[in-house]
UniProtKB/Swiss-Prot annotation:
It comes from Pyricularia oryzae (strain 70-15 / ATCC MYA-4617 / FGSC 8958). It is found in: Nucleus; Cytoplasm; Preautophagosomal structure. Residues 442-468 are annotated as: Disordered. This is Histone acetyltransferase type B catalytic subunit. Residues 44-46, 208-210 are annotated as: Interaction with histone H4 N-terminus.
Amino acid sequence: MAESDLWSVDANSALELSLVEPTEDGLTTVTRFHPRFTYPLFGEEEQIFGYQDLKINLQYHAPDMRPNVKITHSKKFKSIGETQPTDLDALLQGYLPPVAFAKKREFEDAIRLMPADWTPPGEILSEFDGVDGAKFEIRRSNLADDASRQIIDRVQLLILLFIEGGSYIGTDTTDSLDRWDIFFLYNIKPSTTDGTSRYQFAGYSTVYKFFPLQRFPLEPKEAHENLELPSGEFPFSNLRSRTRISQFLILPPFQKSGNGSRLYRTIYDYCLRDPNVIEVTVEDPNEAFDDMRDVADLDFLRQKSEFTDLRINTDIHIPKQGAAPRGVVDEVKSEEARCLYRIAPRQFSRVLEMHLMSRLAETVRPTLVDDKVVAKPTKIETHEYDLWKLFVKQRLYRHNKEVLSQLDRHDRIERLNETLGSVELEYARILALAERRTQATSSNLKRKLDDDENTEGSSSKKARVEDA
């Protein structure tokens, strides 16, 4: 083993994060977890040089996410020339607020001073029951709010540790703070002693408003001559805007329970109620977020007649030569539905394609199972499938026109067919995921109804609640 290997530590293992709460006997750990990756801090190799038995314990006070860092090790490398151990304090100070480096006693004293009836900043948008009886709350605030901005400053490091390509948002430029909305997800734990509820931070999302240039109808000359600018302050909220989901994080202990979908759905519903929001977009989503978003949007739109009424026009004939026909799906009604529900064009097209694929006959519908035995398709079923493929190819061509236009006709057709095959598999996977989510939701609802019936049949509801 090389000398350097003796002094190199895997950063993902060395760094442990935890949520803690104070008790009469000291701090108690609510949950602990390790980062998904640490390359934004320690480089591509995710190694920390200069220590043996290194432990970096980053504790967060569960309600307000006040951080505290504790670093321990058995040995530290003695510097030789330019070869020096990683300066962990200096490195972490670039990512955490100064309060994170207070002594442990100061940290414990500070969090003990938090009032028992403390509540997170912002207005309550949603309350729901999670798995195993867990209760959650989603609140909305704004980055211009001091308490909310303080929490964001404390937790932004988590974005780098769990979101591929994640980045900080600026909290120092006061003139743009009110463009940022913040949506907090909290797990609520009722106290067994004083009747209050304890909040545990479970995740959050930041949403940015930007204001596109808009076209306005020409007005008579008199209107321009009499134009008066509004006096006083003019809030950004009064302007037509697009909203962009920027950061979106659910802490690992609260993942895989539908909490991400709940948070996304709440953000979308909030934006949908705002008459000034033109469109809801997402900034550089990763694959996991894309899947969650696809399933959530599909579930939502399938409840809307403006969407479900969109169908493939099977009266259209596909010529063997010449230009491909348009209007496979009514373009006007499709655009009206998209604008009504303020979904970005590409996202709406994808979800519509998924939905239409799910309505194809089983004899022609693409699936993840290659050897599935099905009946021979009829001509009508095959024709509808051909029209669906044409509909998808037309979008793919528009989206990749610059690249595809440089290929000859044969290569262009081959490339489109290859891409279509990948799209079919992707849609089949997402539709299967949506089906599993629907079944899980139905199962959870049935279990909850059964529990409610048992509770109503109890001779002492109060005792049952307290025992729980």
